[in-house]
C-alpha cells in the first residue's frame, strides 16, 4: 500500500503496535503512529485509536489491508461518519456479504449457482439433521460470520453433526462474536477457485481472471495460489467470470473484491463467499494482468472511473504464489516465533517477493505467521513452476521454523505438476496430519 501511494505521490501514515515498533512498514511511511500495546485487541483492532491517528495526522483515507478490520462493517461505517474515506466497499455491502447465509440468499436471487444448503441460520440440531438426511452426508457446518477456516466442520453422520454444531458455534462466537451457523452439502475433492473483481463507483465492473487456491491445510489455510486455473476451459472460464460479475453487481459492489467458488468434478461451480477486501494472494492477478490492484483501489476510492472495460483486460502467462510462513509442517503447522538471524530473498526475471522481514527482525507472537509471499510469473505453467522451484531453493530464512521445505516438496510433487490439485491435496498427497 505504501509503495502504491508513493508512486501516486500520496503521503502515507503507518500505524503500528508496540510489538511492531521495528516493523518495516513503519519505516517506509512518511509518518508512523503507535496505536497501542502489542495485543491486536489493544491496537490493530482498536478503532478509536486508529481514527484518532487519522485525525492527528490529517489523513483523508484509510486502507484497511487484508486483516484485522478489513471486513468489519462497523469500522467502515465509522470512517464514513467522520468523513474519512474507507478504501473498500461501503459498510452496507461489507455487512451484507459478511453474513454468509444472507449472501447465499442474494446469490440465489441473482442466479449465481450456490452449493445446496440450509435456507438461513440453523436454529436447532433437529433441523440440521433433517437437512443432512435429505441432502445426504457428508455436509459441512459453516459460521455465518466466518472466514479463514474458523467455525467450519465437515461431518459424516448424525453423531458428528451434533458434536460439530456445538464446536462450530463456540469457535464462531469466540472468533467473530457471532455463533450463528448454517449447513451445506460438502462437495468432495473440489477445487477452490476465486475471481478477482474490480468495480468503480460509476457502475463499471471487470474481473481479472481466476486464481486456483485449492492447496490448503486441513485448517483451510491457503498455502499456494496460481492463475489461471489449469482445470478451466475457455467456456467454463467465461461462465465463472460472468457469475462473479453478476455477484458483484447484485450487491452494488465497489473497489476490489474476490468472489469464491467451489469447482466440482463435472465442471459444475458453486458460490462460496465474497471477500470484501484485497486478498493476500492478489499479486498473482497483478502478475498475469499487469494491473496494480492497490493503485486501482486508491483511484476508485478517489472517485475515478476504471480506465478499461472487460474487453480491454488482457491476461498473459501463468503466475504462482507461495505463502512462506513461520510454521513447522512437522508439527501440524505449529507457529514458530523468534529472531530472523539470516534472510535472503530470491530474484531474477519474473520473480517478486512481498515481505516485511529482514535479518535481525523478531517475529512477534501476536499476529499472523506469514513471513513472505514469493510470486513467480512464466510464459506458461511449466515455466512458472520451474521459476518458483529455483526461487525457493535460492531463498534463505534462518532463526525460525518455516514452510520453505514443504513448499519445495509441493512443487516437485508429480500430481501438482500435472495440475491434479484439489482442496484435500496436502492431506492426501503430502501426508499432513
Indicate where each model-derived feature is located:
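A cross-family glycoside hydrolase active-site/sugar-binding cleft signature
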Residues: 15, 65, 117, 184, ...
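Diglycine-centered glycine-rich loop/turn motifs
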Residues: 91, 116-117
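A polyampholytic, Gly/Pro-enriched intrinsically disordered region
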Residues: 104-115, 136-138
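Acidic/histidine-enriched active-site and ligand-binding environments that engage anionic O-linkages
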Residues: 130-140
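ATP-dependent carboxylate activation and anion-phosphoryl transfer catalytic cores
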Residues: 1-7, 32-33, 55-57, 73, ...
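Structural detector of well-ordered beta-strand residues that form the stable sheet scaffold
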Residues: 13, 63, 85-87, 115, ...
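A structural signal for short, well-ordered beta-strand elements
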Residues: 43, 96, 121, 154, ...
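ATP-binding N-terminal substructure of ATP-dependent carboxylate-amine bond-forming enzymes
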Residues: 1-109, 122-130
Amino acid at each position: 500500500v505504501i509503495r502504491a501511494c508513493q508512486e501516486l505521490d500520496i503521503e502515507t501514515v503507518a500505524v503500528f503496535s508496540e510489538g511492531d515498533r521495528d516493523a518495516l512498514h513503519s519505516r517506509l511511511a512518511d509518518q508512523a503512529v503507535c496505536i497501542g500495546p502489542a495485543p491486536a485487541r489493544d491496537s490493530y483492532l482498536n478503532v478509536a485509536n486508529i481514527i484518532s491517528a487519522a485525525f492527528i495526522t490529517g489523513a483523508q483515507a484509510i486502507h484497511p489491508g487484508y486483516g484485522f478490520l478489513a471486513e468489519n462493517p462497523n469500522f467502515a461505517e465509522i470512517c464514513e461518519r467522520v468523513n474519512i474515506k474507507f478504501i473498500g466497499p461501503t459498510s452496507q455491502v461489507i455487512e451484507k456479504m459478511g453474513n454468509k447465509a444472507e449472501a447465499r440468499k442474494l446469490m440465489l436471487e441473482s442466479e449465481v449457482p450456490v452449493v445446496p444448503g440450509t435456507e438461513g441460520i440453523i436454529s436447532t440440531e433437529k433441523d440440521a439433521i433433517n437437512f443432512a438426511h435429505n441432502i445426504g452426508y457428508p455436509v459441512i457446518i459453516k459460521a455465518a460470520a466466518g472466514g479463514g477456516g474458523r467455525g467450519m466442520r465437515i461431518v459424516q453422520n448424525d453423531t458428528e453433526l451434533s458434536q460439530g454444531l456445538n464446536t462450530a458455534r463456540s469457535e464462531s462466537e469466540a472468533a467473530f462474536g457471532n455463533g450463528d451457523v448454517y449447513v451445506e452439502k460438502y462437495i468432495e475433492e473440489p477445487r477452490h477457485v476465486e475471481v478477482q473483481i474490480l468495480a468503480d463507483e460509476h457502475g463499471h465492473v471487470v474481473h481479472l481472471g481466476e486464481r486456483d487456491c485449492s492447496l490448503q491445510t486441513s485448517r483451510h489455510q491457503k498455502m499456494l495460489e496460481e492463475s489461471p486455473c489449469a482445470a478451466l476451459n475457455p467456456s467454463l472460464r467465461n461462465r465463472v467470470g460472468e457469475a462473479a460479475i453478476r455477484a458483484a453487481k447484485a450487491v452494488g459492489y465497489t473497489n476490489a473484491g474476490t468472489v469464491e467458488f467451489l469447482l466440482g468434478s463435472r465442471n459444475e461451480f458453486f458460490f462460496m463467499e465474497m471477500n470484501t477486501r484485497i486478498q493476500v494472494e492478489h499479486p498473482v492477478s497483478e502478475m498475469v494482468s499487469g494491473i496494480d490492484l492497490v493503485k486501482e483501489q486508491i483511484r476508485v476510492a478517489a472517485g475515478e472511473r476504471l480506465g478499461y472495460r472487460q474487453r480491454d483486460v488482457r491476461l498473459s502467462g501463468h503466475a504462482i504464489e507461495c505463502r512462506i510462513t513461520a510454521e513447522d509442517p512437522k508439527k501440524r503447522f505449529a507457529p514458530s516465533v523468534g529472531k530472523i538471524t539470516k534472510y535472503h530473498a530470491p530474484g531474477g526475471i519474473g520473480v517478486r517477493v512481498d515481505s516485511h522481514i529482514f535479518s535481525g527482525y523478531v517475529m512477534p507472537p501476536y499476529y499472523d505467521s506469514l513471513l513472505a509471499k514469493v510470486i513467480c510469473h512464466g510464459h506458461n505453467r511449466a515455466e512458472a513452476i520451474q521459476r518458483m522451484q529455483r526461487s525457493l531453493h535460492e531463498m534463505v530464512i534462518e532463526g525460525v521454523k518455516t514452510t520453505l521445505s514443504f513448499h519445495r516438496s509441493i512443487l516437485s510433487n508429480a500430481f501438482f505438476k500435472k495440475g491434479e490439485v484439489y482442496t484435500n491435496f496436502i492431506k492426501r498427497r503430502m501426508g499432513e496430519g
